[in-house]
């Protein structure tokens, strides 16, 4: 009888521990901070109380369209942020220097365009630091903003970026210009329901270069000021 009770007690304890373990996994899955969502530490927009908007160009190709993009920015007297892919910069070092010399902001887009949400903490650090080191070697400028390739990030990604002194940047508007080669569509996506603090994702494509003067004209006519991302997010506090 005593043995039976003892067995029942042990069984109940084991079952209780299993329930607690399953509950812990459900409520606090691996890689998710219990102190708050990882996304709370990432910038999806800038200062929403301002009239600032920011074009952010993610660059792993399209070097032939960048001169036209730079000319349009110069024409309107504004500057944008270019998130540079490291392996691209290795082949187009003069283009990187040209972007910088014309007053635009350089930022970090990783080295090999990996899915950084799948990388370890150290793997993320390697991707980010390798790109940052290259841009600094080419221009003497240290990058402080990081946009994850394909918008894919995890807690490891954000921790790695912050450990290296970066702020992680996403976007509030996506023109999807890498896929949809239509200047009118790109223009509409960049300007529809525009709001202060918008971070507008673009890439150097032929159609983006064609649409850009009209986009910048729309900003100006509607009282918005195109500024680099660092200016737009200045003063915006994150967790």
Located regions from the model:
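Active-site beta->alpha N-cap acidic-glycine motif
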Residues: 31-117, 123, 127-134, 142-143, ...
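Terminal accessory/targeting
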Residues: 1-56, 71-81, 195-239
């Amino acid at each position: 009888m005593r043995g039976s009770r003892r067995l029942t007690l042990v069984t109940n304890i084991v079952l209780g521990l299993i329930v607690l373990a399953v509950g812990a996994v459900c409520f606090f899955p691996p890689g998710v901070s219990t102190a708050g969502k990882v996304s709370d530490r990432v910038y999806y927009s800038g200062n929403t109380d301002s009239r600032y908007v920011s074009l952010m160009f993610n660059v792993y190709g399209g070097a032939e369209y960048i001169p036209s993009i730079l000319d349009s920015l110069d024409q309107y007297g504004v500057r944008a942020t270019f998130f540079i892919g490291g392996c691209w910069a290795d082949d187009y070092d003069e283009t990187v220097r040209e972007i910088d010399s014309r007053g635009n902001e350089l930022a970090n887009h990783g080295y090999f365009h990996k899915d950084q949400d799948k990388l370890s903490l150290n793997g993320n650090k390697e991707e980010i630091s390798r790109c940052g080191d290259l841009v600094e070697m080419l221009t003497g400028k240290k990058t402080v903003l990081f946009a994850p390739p394909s918008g894919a990030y995890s807690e490891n990604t954000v921790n790695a970026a912050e450990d290296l002194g970066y702020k992680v940047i996403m976007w509030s508007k996506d023109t999807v210009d890498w896929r949809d080669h239509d200047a009118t569509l790109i223009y509409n996506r960049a300007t529809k329901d525009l709001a202060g603090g918008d971070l507008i994702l673009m890439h150097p494509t032929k159609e983006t270069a064609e649409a850009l003067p009209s986009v910048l004209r729309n900003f100006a006519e509607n009282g918005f000021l195109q500024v680099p991302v660092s200016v737009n997010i200045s003063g915006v506090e994150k967790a």
